[in-house]
């Protein structure tokens, strides 16, 4: 769907569908007030009412949508409102529709237009790749959304459309990748998708296979992947190396294309959802897509450890001791705590770039879902300034993060009696000890870990712009944080 902006009087605009957002206390403009019955409209948040003007206006249809109380404007609610409008436009089978940009206190036309664009594109997302019996009309999408703005706000709104569109396309790429079945998205295929992205934006990419990883000493990734016929890959994409004076930010993603648990095998119930155990890698690729589209003046290095964790005659075992890329030794106590082992090598490699910050994203622990549920990302960091930067970005982007502690007693819990660290510590503080394990592999560099295990997948539809399945979480937070970095 193409999104554009134009200036004009909404009530004089000829369109298949005119979307007009109204606050609870806002009066209906004439002649709309004469076209509905008293009591049919209140303006409560997300209420909708479809009106057929029948010649009273140039628009063929008008969709009123409630914005709630004017005293509590909310960009995330604007995303939801835009998603609802777009979905209704698709239901009505219109080719194009217009949306009047509301005025929100403490927000600019750019931020509001960005939120509307995000919500519309995220709300129109559907994963239909494996639906073989759909008719063409069932795959039909709206062609164009036109935002209506005052003349003096058109340029600002256009910038918002560019930003919101890039972010939404990045999120939807991440959703696509995490929704793919594991028989189609193997580590090798994930590397191919990464290469397609790199080629599209003319970015340098390096993909290491098992032989190259063995030669360089990637003992963690190799061990986790050795039980599967689908061999692991290590992927690096380098963006913005020409920005020599800009910070270097490393984005590290866990890319388990399927996680059976290995020898410490998971229960059968819900194991199918473990195709999304590469959501961290998906978020990194989605973010990089948006970064490249927006041409952010930063040096960003995307690093992904991709593997499949399977039981088998060659699988790694509880009791094994692994030598990682850093030289540190890991005692394996549970093969289902594999993501941290993969990330140990990825985080070690990231240090070669001497980054200003390393940010990793991973569906790392079920414990974070128990602690925070589906409403917040678990955030851990060895640098308070970096942590607060990410918290602020999450609030602004609509992807909240909550910081948990990494005190020394937690770091003591991951120490091994017979190796340097152990990959499992029991039930207590599971999300924290997993982060403490990762902390052992980042050196002295500022580092943050985003545990997205509770937010990467949804079996419901918690928000209008968030369908069932992969959420693409992390992309919006990262883009907001990186944009803030360019303005610091």
Curated annotation (Swiss-Prot):
The coenzyme or cofactor needed here is: Mn(2+)
Gene Ontology molecular function, alphabetical: manganese ion binding; metalloaminopeptidase activity
Query: What start-end ranges are recorded for coiled-coil regions in this protein?
Result: none
Q: Provide the protein's localization.
A: Cytoplasm
Q: Superkingdom of the source?
A: Bacteria
Q: Which Pfam families match?
A: Peptidase_M17, Peptidase_M17_N
EC number(s) recorded for this UniProt protein:
3.4.11.1, 3.4.11.10
List the keywords (alphabetical). Answer: Aminopeptidase, Cytoplasm, Hydrolase, Manganese, Metal-binding, Protease
What InterPro entries does this protein's entry cite? Leucine_aapep/pepB (IPR011356), Macro_dom-like (IPR043472), Peptidase_M17_C (IPR000819), Peptidase_M17_leu_NH2_pept (IPR023042), Peptidase_M17_N (IPR008283)
Query: Chief localization class?
Result: cytoplasm
Q: Which residues bind Mn(2+) 1?
A: 259, 336, 338
Concerning PROSITE patterns, the annotation shows: CYTOSOL_AP (PS00631)
The note describing how and how many cofactors are bound reads:
Binds 2 manganese ions per subunit.
Its GO biological process annotations read:
proteolysis
Q: Where does Mn(2+) 2 bind?
A: 254, 259, 277, 338
Catalytic reaction list: Release of an N-terminal amino acid, Xaa-|-Yaa-, in which Xaa is preferably Leu, but may be other amino acids including Pro although not Arg or Lys, and Yaa may be Pro. Amino acid amides and methyl esters are also readily hydrolyzed, but rates on arylamides are exceedingly low; Release of an N-terminal amino acid, preferentially leucine, but not glutamic or aspartic acids
Q: Which residues form the active site?
A: 266, 340
Q: Which family does it belong to?
A: Belongs to the peptidase M17 family.
Q: What is this protein called?
A: Probable cytosol aminopeptidase
What organism does the UniProt record list as the source? Roseiflexus castenholzii (strain DSM 13941 / HLO8)
Gene transcribed to yield this protein: pepA
